[in-house]
């Protein structure tokens, strides 16, 4: 018999069913979503993940991400919240900030950090909002040359990124012959453009950045220097690549690439004395902290994702261990081994090699392109992504493949294993060229994919390579939650 609650009948059976729904495991509650997750888990387990921006988070990070912290709203900052019941959230966020500064060896008197950005793109936009007035000028590495979409990318016909819509953007470039950043040309253009902010950051650039040179250019133009170290943040922790903190005013990062945490972002900013007035001797302080914090909240975000902040805190603790530092050294060693093996197989690597976790393979000499190779390799259980190479005429048919080693290094692959991976890639690209020869030089990507999917001869070759790849990948355990 139903009882009345606030004048409305309550169905006891229905309410009991509601309580059961809240307690059901995902497998029973939503079989469709569970099945999709299981399929994706299997894809990751049997495939070779070579996308440079991906990694496998640890079990501890994923447990924090799936915790009760997801339930709590906490707009504001520690000690200054707009909600009650946030004492433990304050404790967590303060711990995450402390670990972030410790991980990168930063003095809390000289640096602060905001750990609330939802990811790297919001972190970057918050910095622009804080430091550059609307339609103010910024300079970042051009997307086709290895930069990132959020660094102000636009084409001749359209402003693509919101950064280029709300701010005036001028890209700097690499030398098309060497693939290295053309710092001389950047310096000349900065004198003409007078940027308020220069961005030192990349998404597909295999060499270390010259932060000292970039800071000199920034100082000559009265500009801030911001590093976007999203791709290399784990390498920076381990000290295997140069740190941006010595020269930059602001440093942003994601937390899920080489840092191997969950998906989130951080903004580091200088605090304390910026300069001393030569006439009065008065100290001039940085005001970045208040500007950046207010840009993140309430400027661009609402309540922080506390479960993600917990995952970041866990990842930062792991990043300060000797094991993590050894892992990062192996990431770089594996990347160099992969590069050397591909060169031996006759491939051109943009810049001739790598200082970090990724390489860009130029396929023009092989007579094919990144889009077609990506599709064939994907069919063979090898995940990577197409990418423009210096000198490409069109972003619609990029010549390169971006390959990274962080994810497979997390699974335990070493240099000798990456030599085998290089041979798998080589066989996939040879198959790409064969399919392209069958479709003709004027065939579209759509026609190429139809040939790949519909031709039994090519499908047999794909199946044979995929079976070898999956048998090899299954030898290496997949980090993360058991069952997924």
Curated annotation (Swiss-Prot):
It catalyses: (6R)-5,10-methylene-5,6,7,8-tetrahydrofolate + glycine + H2O = (6S)-5,6,7,8-tetrahydrofolate + L-serine. It is found in: Cytoplasm. One of its GO terms (cellular component) is nucleoplasm. The modification N6-(pyridoxal phosphate)lysine is found at residue 257. Pathway: One-carbon metabolism; tetrahydrofolate interconversion. The active site is at residues 204, 256. The modification Deamidated asparagine is found at residue 6. There is a cross-link at residues 6-7 (Isoaspartyl glycine isopeptide (Asn-Gly)). Keywords: Acetylation, Cytoplasm, Isopeptide bond, One-carbon metabolism, Pyridoxal phosphate, Transferase. InterPro entries: PyrdxlP-dep_Trfase, PyrdxlP-dep_Trfase_major, PyrdxlP-dep_Trfase_small, Ser_HO-MeTrfase, Ser_HO-MeTrfase-like, Ser_HO-MeTrfase_PLP_BS, SHMT-like_dom. It comes from the Eukaryota. Its cofactor is pyridoxal 5'-phosphate. The modification N-acetylalanine is found at residue 2. Its EC number is 2.1.2.1. One of its GO terms (biological process) is L-serine metabolic process. Deamidation of asparagine produces alternatively aspartate or isoaspartate, which in turn can be converted to aspartate through carboxylmethylation/demethylation. One of its GO terms (molecular function) is protein homodimerization activity. Interconversion of serine and glycine. Belongs to the SHMT family. In eukaryotes there are two forms of the enzymes: a cytosolic one and a mitochondrial one. Homotetramer. Identified in complex with ABRAXAS2 and the other subunits of the BRISC complex, at least composed of ABRAXAS2, BRCC3/BRCC36, BABAM2 and BABAM1/NBA1. HAMAP family: SHMT. This is Serine hydroxymethyltransferase, cytosolic. It comes from Oryctolagus cuniculus.
């Amino acid at each position: 018999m139903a009882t009345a609650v606030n004048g409305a009948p309550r169905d006891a059976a229905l309410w009991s069913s509601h309580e059961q729904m809240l307690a059901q495991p995902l497998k029973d509650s939503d079989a469709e979503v569970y099945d999709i997750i299981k399929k994706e888990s299997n894809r990751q387990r049997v495939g070779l993940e070579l996308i440079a921006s991906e990694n496998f988070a640890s079990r501890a990070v994923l447990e924090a991400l799936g915790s009760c912290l997801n339930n709590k709203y906490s707009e504001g900052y520690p000690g200054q919240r707009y909600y009650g019941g946030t004492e433990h959230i304050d404790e967590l966020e303060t711990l995450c900030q402390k670990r972030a500064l410790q991980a990168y060896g930063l003095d809390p008197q000289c640096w602060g950090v905001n750990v609330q950005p939802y990811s790297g793109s919001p972190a970057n936009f918050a910095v622009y909002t804080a430091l550059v007035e609307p339609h103010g000028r910024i300079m970042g590495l051009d997307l086709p040359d290895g930069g990132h979409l959020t660094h102000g990318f636009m084409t001749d016909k359209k402003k693509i990124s919101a950064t280029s819509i709300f701010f005036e953007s001028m890209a700097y470039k690499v030398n098309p012959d060497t693939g290295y950043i053309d710092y001389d040309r950047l310096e000349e253009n900065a004198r003409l453009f007078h940027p308020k902010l220069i961005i030192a950051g990349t998404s597909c650039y295999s060499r270390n950045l010259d932060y000292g040179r970039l800071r000199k250019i920034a100082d000559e133009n009265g500009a801030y220097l911001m590093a976007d170290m999203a791709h290399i943040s784990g390498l920076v922790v381990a000290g295997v690549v140069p740190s941006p903190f010595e020269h930059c005013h602001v440093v942003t990062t994601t937390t899920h690439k080489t840092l191997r945490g969950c998906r989130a972002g951080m903004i580091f900013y200088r605090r304390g004395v910026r300069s001393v007035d030569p006439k009065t001797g008065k100290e001039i302080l940085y005001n970045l902290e208040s500007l950046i914090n207010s840009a993140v909240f309430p400027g661009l975000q609402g309540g922080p994702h506390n479960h993600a902040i917990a995952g970041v805190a866990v990842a930062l603790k792991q990043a300060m261990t000797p094991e993590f530092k050894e892992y990062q050294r192996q990431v770089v060693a594996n990347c160099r081994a992969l590069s050397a093996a591909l060169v031996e197989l006759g491939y051109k690597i943009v810049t001739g090699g790598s200082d970090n976790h990724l390489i860009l393979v130029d396929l023009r000499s092989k007579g094919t392109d990144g889009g077609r190779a990506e599709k064939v390799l994907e069919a063979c259980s090898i995940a990577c992504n197409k990418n423009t190479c210096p000198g490409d005429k069109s972003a619609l048919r990029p010549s390169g493949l971006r390959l990274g080693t962080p994810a497979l290094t997390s699974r335990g692959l070493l240099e000798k294993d990456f030599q085998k991976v290089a041979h798998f890639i080589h066989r996939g690209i040879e198959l790409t060229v064969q399919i392209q020869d069958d479709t003709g030089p004027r065939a579209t990507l759509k026609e190429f994919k139809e040939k790949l999917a519909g031709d039994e001869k090519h499908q047999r070759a794909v199946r044979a390579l995929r079976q070898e790849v999956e048998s090899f990948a299954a030898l290496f355990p997949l980090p993360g939650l058991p069952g997924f």
